[in-house]
Amino acid sequence: RILVCQMGGCSGREVRELKIAATERLINKYEVNLSAFMELNYNWATVASSANLASWFRHEEREVRSVAAHNQHETTTRHQPGGTGMVCRYEFLQYARKPSNDFRGLGRWCSWPIYCNPTHSTRVVVAYRTGSGKSKGLRTIYQQQIRYMQLHNITGTPQQLFDKDLLHQCKLWRKSGERIILLLDANEHVLTGKFNRQISRTGLDLEEFTHKCWGAHQPYTHINGSIPIDGGYKSPEIEVLNVCMLPFLDSPGDHRAFIIDISTRSLLGEFRYKVCRPISRRLITSQQRSVDEYNRIVNEQFDRHRIVIRLDAVDKMTRYCGFPAPNFLRAMIIKLYRQMTEIRIHAEKKCRKILRPDSDYSPTVQM
């Protein structure tokens, strides 16, 4: 089950937390395996590699992995319009292989091949296609791509370059035998727009499938729009069982989110069982090596962030101010203890490495 969300920007912390909380509610309610996001508006080059897209989902009990793409040629601020990403969780993790991004480094799309058998591979692609309007401002997606095209002497418009590059990449994937699920914010009508016509002209065997759930009247997928600009394309081998468009009220961004059910038979192949790895703790007190490594990381982080010195300072200020403590002191204490908790969680995740080599399943047990 795949959840598709047009986030409309997540660079601000307050807005991001609200949108991610809404996304987590949808993930838990509908038991989503893979989440695809467009227009994250986040420059991942300005943060540490550990602060990835998966780190935004703090309430997940089990491991999650992510892939994200942004414009790698401009790294001025954390807010950067555009970008795409995906988050994989639960039983999908064991089938998700090495992801890839836009080969021009513009963050227009990212993809994740999913397979159990390499001869039966399905590639999930999430893409964001800029609109045809020449948006004002120097940091818009349109202006970013125009600057790239001028720098490399590429003629045409950003939309033409996107259509040419993505369809060429899809052809290469199809030629290598991969099945394709393309999830797209086209910024135009997904059936009558230029991108869909380009698919027909190039002879690529992709068809739009979300329109089959529209009913008698086509919906508008942007809150201020009048036509469906968000959709999905698939190769003929993919079996789409259900498509559900959510209302704007339940969607995290300003576009309607939608959920797609795809058969395991077409995605992974015949006779594949639903296997989910159990949760394994890295910190085990009976293993002295993991305990020593945990203590080493905690002490190192405590020294780096001067935790003990700050605790002594807070203790002295508490004695001086008395009870009840002023608001600024309460906020300082809460922040300090929250940081101590984060350090312990970080140390628990890093104290022992768990290897998960690929291994065959045992033969079927004969009763």
What does each of the following model-derived ranges do?
Residues 16-23, 50, 144, 153-168, ...:
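Well-ordered, non-membrane alpha-helical segments in soluble/globular domains
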Residues 18-31, 116-118, 157-181:
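Short, basic/hydrophobic alpha-helical segments
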Residues 114-150, 237-367:
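Surface polyanion/phosphate-binding segment centered on an Asp-His-Pro turn
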Residues 33, 87, 91-108, 172-180, ...:
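Metal-dependent phosphoester-hydrolase catalytic domains
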Residues 41-132, 246-252:
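Structured beta-strand-rich core segments of catalytic domains in phosphoester-bond hydrolases
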Residues 1-54, 76-79, 186, 289-290, ...:
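N-terminal, active-site-proximal structural segment of metallo-dependent hydrolase catalytic domains
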Residues 4-15, 135, 140-155:
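Acidic/histidine-rich helix-loop elements
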Residues 13-16, 74-77, 156, 196, ...:
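Conserved, non-catalytic sequence blocks in retroelement Pol enzymes and Pol-derived host proteins
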